[in-house]
């Protein structure tokens, strides 16, 4: 077939020359491609056909494939046939291929058409969707725009509403301020009138309205009317150094100079008593620190001879005293030192004697000289009158040395001026120590804790008062430890001797008080340690001194996360302070949110009735967590007479508060800072050189070195350096410290280096760390149990050194850091490692957990253990601790409801889970036996019920309260007072649940039990009456509510407040003890007056027997010193008569009143208020005892006195005329009573108006008189007019028409034979 040396180009049909020459070789394989092959064959045949027979062959390079082939090989038929066959085959294949491809093209065309159709459809759908989307998007935008517009309108409306509310409140308070100004002007005019009349100038003002104690005041609708009966006791104004009572004008009894009246407790009314309690609560700094020291601190002094007795006392009896004090919530410390022959610890011993509340001396035959000085200071030089106990062991044949006998004689010669008691014993030492224990127990109960009459009263009553102590507070949960802490904080902050540069700040604070309302709170700002607390405490003292009518409520916040920084406890405490000034102590919710809502209402309520200003001071308020959330009431307009002052650090002040009026405390001037330091140095006989003074001046240029706390620490360091003799070195070290924390680090280093041993240094470090990681501090007794190997000498020396350098202080019996910078310094110095913090917390946890395992649940373990678990993040342990019902009970009963709730929230339990788990925990107590255990179980159920009630789980609260009721009825008696307590609590739940019918039944049952157990005039019965009054008021049954409220008030008037029902009575008791110490000298008028005041104080405590003793001693001393006809003797007689009247000894009271009246008639002017006072109460007594004939001339004399004092047309004269007319009506002398009634009616109508309630009362009395004379038509007319006045008053008061009684508390009821329902005449004061 020839070679394939040339090929046709597939693209151009050209021949491709063989590049390898003419040499033969194998033919190249043509690629199998249909189109090039067909083209190749067609062209070959065309060329072959064109040549035909006879045509010339082409050149070698230009022929086709066949030609070439033929040329090279010649023609061959088989090959031609083969080629034709190949051609046909290829042609068929081509046709097949073409047909298939055409079909594919048609199919693809159809698919393309279909896809185009689908594409168009999808495009149309997409366009429709896009249009829908655009429409929806436009609708959404429109809706959002509408929403934003609506929100803007809502915000605008809310702002407008708040603005209107604020404007209205401002308007209302402005008007109230105007009213207060008018009332203040009225009181000033009345005061001027009193002074003029005291000078003998008669001033007649017929337009003056009657202002007797029981004059009816028409108040706004819904205002609660309150009553207080007059107390017939008087005393001079020497108590005014502690209590200044407002003396509003109240008729002839207070018409003259206040110097001449009976005193602050004469004719005492409700407002005066509130002011007295406020004064007592504010007079805390007047009492010595030892009286307020929370631990019962016994300092033991012994000799070598009596050391066995001392050790026996510590071993056998000290634990019993400790348990007794723990039960009452106090610490007991028995402190003793080793015998200090060389007087190495003289300073520490003196400091311990000064702190102690009781000194016990164990004495035998000798008294070493180094102990004699301590004994003389403890027993002979005892200005505070602290109790002491001397145990003198006698022994046959052994002579007591002269020093011992002389000391005992000196103590004995002091007599009643000392409270030292000597116990002489000659038998078995164990018996002598037992006598010491009995004496110490009695001193603790009577002299230290003020429980002097508890046992006596129980014996006298013939029954045991088993009502728990906290029930004396009613439904109010009061924490005495929190109050104690605040009192001590105020004492400590106000005890500084240096207050340079504060005068300008005092003036700014004074301007705030007198500034016109409304005014936002004043912000006192400054750097750490700038003296904010000192400024506020000193200013409080000045306010109490110069403005005794100002009520000041203060709270000093401690370090962060302590109890004093809990916002809910702050609000609760301030609310309780406000509630103390109201007669009925109502239930107080413990829900933090509700407390925050109710506090402004209580504040507004008190401001409306308080005559002076109310100032609320919160120091370091920025230490309160989430302060802006929990103190929202600060941003609202305050009542007119309320001012608020808060102090903050500049760095931590909330941003929203920075717009308030601000008083910024600048650092001390360099001159003042240097003067304080040099003065302290001079006091220690340290003289700085001129060069050292220049260095000090240069050091005091920066502001951080002139803060008050920094300067104080600097001066203390220099004073200590003077005692140590290293002034230059200490000065150099102090000059390196540029802020308070760095100076505290230096102080800490110096104190540590001053410790006598490495062991003491280690103890000091551990004590500081334990105090730092604790919740509220650590007590000395707890430290002694944590470190048994530590002696009292070591502990006292460490505490004394730290206390002296302003590192530690005492608060509520606990050791705490004196300043926040001291706490921060210890944290930076020793506790930067979290593992160390955790280890110290675990040490405290182990200690308090061991107490729980021994069933010793005290307020300390309840305060510390849950908090420590929370800080450690131990949820399981905290959960187990909370399920200890005694811990939960302790927290709840002290009002720490919010704290308890936060622990449960930390554990992750809701309200329902709490209730369920507490119910499960109570099941383990159900099998307890014995009355004591059953009563404990009942108390736990009651606490749980009250807790659930405060949570709002009323249906679940009913179950435990009913269970508590069942247990008490079973274990005690159905008529026991504790059963009444359960009924009262259960009824309270039903009231909150709106089940008034059930509540009414329970309250009435509790009232019946209380009256049977205590008597109808006991405060427990008054509490049930108040609850019933509140219940009826909620049901709009105003007449029944008024009836029960009146009965309750009468009981309160007769009994005053029972001892212990207010925390202020502890102050009264201790004030009484101090006054008693002042009366033990010679007979002097001052001592007689003090004895009279003591009688008044004990009378206010309802301790009538003791009051009678002091009043009798006052009378006897005055008769000896002043003579029996002196007016002061009349005062004592008058007070004794009032006391006998209270005891229902009417004959004795009558005799005393007559003697007092006789003296005052001879000694005083005819219109003197003291004479009018005696005349009034003697006339009331005559009337009460049925001696009407004797009462008539006294009532006539009262009319004359009032006419001389006020003029013939004064309403007070009309009141006296009505009382005289009522008396004549009782005697059936209608002709003499009628003109008196008519004259009184004319005076009332002219001065008070024709629709005044006093006019209505007089009309009613005239109607009675006309009825008894048979003139029924006139009686009906008068009675109709009286009822019209009463109805008008009732509608004005919203359906609550207050009752009106005479000042004597009497309402005269006449029964006639004409009708059993005849209206009754009324007397007036």
Curated annotation (Swiss-Prot):
TPR repeats lie at residues 467-500, 881-914, 916-937, 938-971, 980-1013, 1022-1055, 1088-1121, 1130-1163, 1172-1205, 1214-1247, 1256-1289. The keyword Flavoprotein does not apply. Its main location: other. Transmembrane segments: none annotated. Disulfide bonds: none annotated. Disruption phenotype: Mice show situs inversus, congenital heart defects, and embryonic lethality. A lipid is attached at residue 2 (N-myristoyl glycine). Residues 107-203 form a coiled coil. Keywords: Cell projection, Cilium, Coiled coil, Disease variant, Lipoprotein, Myristate, Repeat, TPR repeat, Wnt signaling pathway. Interacts with NPHP1 and INVS/NPHP2. Interacts (when myristoylated) with UNC119 and UNC119B; interaction is required for localization to cilium. Interacts with CEP164. Component of a complex containing at least ANKS6, INVS, NEK8 and NPHP3. ANKS6 may organize complex assembly by linking INVS and NPHP3 to NEK8 and INVS may target the complex to the proximal ciliary axoneme. Required for normal ciliary development and function. Inhibits disheveled-1-induced canonical Wnt-signaling activity and may also play a role in the control of non-canonical Wnt signaling that regulates planar cell polarity. Probably acts as a molecular switch between different Wnt signaling pathways. Required for proper convergent extension cell movements. This is Nephrocystin-3. It comes from Mus musculus.
């Amino acid at each position: 077939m020839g070679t394939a040396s040339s090929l046709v180009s597939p693209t151009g049909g050209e021949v491709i020359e063989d590049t390898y020459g003419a040499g033969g070789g194998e033919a190249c394989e043509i690629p199998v491609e249909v189109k090039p092959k067909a083209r190749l064959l067609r062209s070959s045949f065309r060329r072959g056909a064109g040549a035909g027979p006879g045509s010339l062959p082409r050149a070698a390079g230009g022929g086709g494939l066949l030609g070439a082939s033929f040329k090279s090989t010649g023609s061959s038929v088989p090959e031609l046939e083969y080629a034709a066959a190949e051609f046909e085959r290829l042609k068929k294949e081509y046709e097949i291929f073409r047909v298939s491809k055409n079909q594919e093209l048609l199919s693809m065309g159809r698919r393309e058409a279909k896809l185009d159709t689908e594409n168009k459809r999808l495009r149309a759908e997409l366009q429709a969707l896009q249009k829908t989307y655009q429409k929806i998007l436009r609708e959404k935008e429109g809706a959002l725009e509408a929403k934003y517009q609506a929100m803007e309108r809502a915000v605008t409306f809310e702002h407008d509403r708040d603005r209107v509310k604020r404007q209205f409140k401002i308007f209302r308070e402005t008007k109230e301020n105007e009213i207060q100004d008018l009332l203040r002007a009225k009181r000033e005019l009345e005061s001027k009138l009193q002074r003029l009349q005291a000078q003998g100038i008669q001033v007649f003002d017929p337009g003056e309205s009657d202002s007797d104690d029981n004059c009816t005041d028409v108040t706004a609708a819904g205002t609660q009317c309150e009553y207080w009966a007059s107390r017939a006791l008087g005393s001079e104004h020497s108590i005014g150094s502690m209590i200044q009572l407002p003396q509003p004008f109240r008729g002839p009894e207070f018409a003259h100079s206040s110097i001449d009246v009976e005193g602050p407790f004469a004719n005492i009314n409700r407002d005066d008593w509130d002011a007295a309690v406020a004064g007592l609560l504010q007079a805390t700094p007047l009492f010595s620190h030892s009286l307020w020291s929370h631990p019962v601190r016994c300092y033991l002094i012994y000799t070598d001879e009596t050391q066995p007795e001392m050790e026996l006392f510590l071993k056998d009896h000290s634990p019993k005293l400790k348990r007794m004090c723990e039960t009452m919530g106090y610490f007991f410390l028995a402190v003793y030192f080793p015998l200090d022959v060389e007087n190495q610890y003289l300073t520490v011993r003196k400091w311990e004697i000064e702190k102690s509340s009781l000194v016990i001396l164990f004495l035998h035959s000798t008294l070493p000289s180094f102990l004699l000085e301590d004994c003389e200071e403890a027993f002979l030089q005892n200005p505070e009158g602290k109790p002491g106990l001397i145990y003198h062991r006698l022994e046959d044949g052994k002579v007591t040395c002269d020093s011992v006998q002389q000391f005992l004689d000196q103590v004995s010669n002091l007599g009643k001026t000392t409270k030292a008691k000597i116990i002489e014993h000659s038998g078995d030492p164990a018996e002598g120590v037992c006598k010491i224990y009995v004496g110490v127990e009695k001193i603790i109960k009577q002299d230290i804790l003020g429980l002097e009459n508890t046992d006596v009263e129980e014996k006298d009553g013939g029954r045991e008062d088993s009502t728990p102590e906290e029930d004396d507070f009613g439904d109010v949960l009061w924490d005495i430890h929190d109050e104690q802490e605040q009192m001590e904080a105020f004492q400590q902050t106000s005890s500084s001797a240096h207050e340079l540069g504060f005068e300008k700040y005092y003036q700014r604070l004074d301007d705030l008080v007198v500034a016109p309302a409304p005014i936002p709170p004043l912000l006192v700002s400054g750097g750490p340690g700038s003296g904010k607390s000192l400024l506020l405490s000193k200013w409080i003292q000045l306010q109490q001194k110069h403005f005794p009518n100002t009520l000041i409520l203060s709270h000093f916040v401690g370090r962060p996360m302590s109890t004093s920084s809990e916002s809910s406890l702050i609000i609760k405490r301030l609310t309780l302070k406000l509630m103390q000034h109201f007669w009925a102590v109502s239930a107080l919710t413990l829900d933090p949110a509700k407390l925050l809502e109710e506090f402004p209402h209580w504040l507004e309520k008190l401001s409306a009735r308080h005559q002076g200003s109310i100032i609320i001071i919160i120091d370091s308020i920025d230490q309160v967590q989430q302060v802006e959330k929990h103190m929202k009431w600060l941003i609202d307009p305050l009542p007119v007479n309320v001012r608020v002052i808060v102090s903050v650090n500049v760095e931590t002040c909330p941003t929203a508060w920075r717009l308030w009026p601000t008083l910024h405390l600048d650092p001390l001037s360099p001159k003042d800072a240097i003067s304080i330091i040099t003065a302290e140095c001079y006091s220690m006989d340290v003289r700085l050189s001129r060069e050292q003074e220049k260095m000090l001046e240069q050091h005091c240029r920066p502001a951080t070195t002139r803060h008050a706390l920094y300067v104080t620490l600097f001066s203390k360091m220099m004073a200590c350096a003077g005692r140590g003799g290293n002034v230059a070195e200490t000065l150099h070290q102090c000059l390196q410290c540029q802020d308070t924390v760095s100076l505290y680090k230096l102080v800490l280093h110096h104190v540590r280096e001053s410790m006598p041993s490495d062991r003491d240094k280690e103890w000091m470090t551990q004590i500081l760390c334990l105090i730092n990681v604790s919740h509220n501090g650590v007590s000395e007794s707890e430290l002694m149990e944590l470190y048994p190997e530590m002696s009292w000498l070591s502990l006292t020396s460490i505490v004394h050194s730290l206390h002296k350098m302003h590192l530690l202080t005492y608060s509520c019996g606990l050791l705490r850091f004196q300043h926040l910078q001291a706490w921060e310094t210890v944290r930076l110095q020793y506790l930067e490692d979290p593992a160390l913090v955790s280890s110290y917390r675990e040490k405290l946890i182990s200690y308090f957990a061991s107490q729980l395992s021994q069933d010793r649940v005290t307020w300390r373990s309840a305060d510390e253990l849950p908090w420590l678990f929370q800080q450690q993040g131990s949820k399981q342990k905290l959960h187990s601790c909370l399920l200890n019902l005694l811990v939960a009970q302790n927290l709840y009963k002290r009002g720490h409801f919010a704290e308890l709730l936060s622990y449960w929230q930390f554990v992750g339990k809701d309200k329902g889970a709490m209730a369920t788990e507490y119910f499960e925990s109570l099941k383990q107590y159900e099998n307890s036996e014995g009355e004591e255990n059953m009563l404990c179980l009942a108390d736990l159920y009651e606490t749980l019920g009250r807790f659930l009630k405060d949570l709002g789980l009323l249906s679940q609260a009913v179950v435990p309260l009913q269970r508590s009721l069942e247990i008490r009825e079973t274990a005690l008696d159905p008529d026991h007072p504790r059963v009444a307590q359960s009924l009262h609590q259960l009824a309270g739940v039903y009231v909150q649940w709106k089940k008034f019918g059930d509540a009414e039944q329970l309250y009435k049952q509790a009232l019946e039990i209380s009256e049977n157990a205590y008597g109808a005039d006991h405060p427990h019965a008054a509490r049930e009456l108040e609850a019933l009054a509140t219940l009826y008021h909620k049901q709009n049954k105003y007449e029944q509510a008024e009836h029960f409220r009146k009965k309750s008030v009468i009981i309160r008037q007769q009994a005053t407040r029972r001892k212990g029902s207010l925390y202020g009575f502890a102050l009264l008791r201790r004030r009484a003890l101090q006054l008693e110490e002042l009366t033990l000298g010679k007979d002097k008028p001052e001592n007689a007056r003090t004895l009279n005041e003591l009688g008044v104080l004990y009378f206010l405590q309802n301790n009538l027997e003791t009051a009678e003793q002091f009043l009798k001693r006052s009378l006897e001393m005055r008769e000896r010193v002043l003579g029996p006809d002196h007016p002061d003797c009349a005062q004592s007689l008058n007070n004794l008569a009032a006391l006998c009247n209270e005891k229902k000894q009417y004959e004795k009271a009558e005799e005393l009143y007559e003697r007092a009246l006789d003296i005052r008639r001879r000694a005083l002017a005819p219109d003197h208020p003291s004479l009018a006072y005696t005349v009034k109460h003697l006339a009331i007594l005559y009337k009460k005892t049925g001696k009407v004939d004797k009462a008539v001339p006294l009532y006539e004399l009262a009319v004359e006195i009032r006419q001389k004092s006020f003029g013939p047309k004064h309403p007070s004269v009309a009141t006296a005329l009505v009382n005289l007319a009522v008396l004549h009506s009782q005697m059936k002398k209608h002709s003499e009573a009628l003109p008196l009634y008519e004259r009184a009616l004319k005076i009332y109508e002219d001065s008070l108006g024709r629709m005044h309630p006093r006019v209505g009362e007089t009309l009613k009395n005239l109607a009675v008189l006309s009825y008894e004379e048979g003139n029924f038509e006139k009686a009906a007319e008068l009675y109709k007019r009286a009822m019209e006045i009463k109805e008008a008053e009732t509608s004005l008061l919203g359906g609550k028409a207050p009752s009106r009684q005479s000042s004597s508390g009497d309402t005269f009821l006449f029964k006639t034979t004409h009708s059993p329902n005849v209206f009754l005449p009324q007397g007036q004061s």
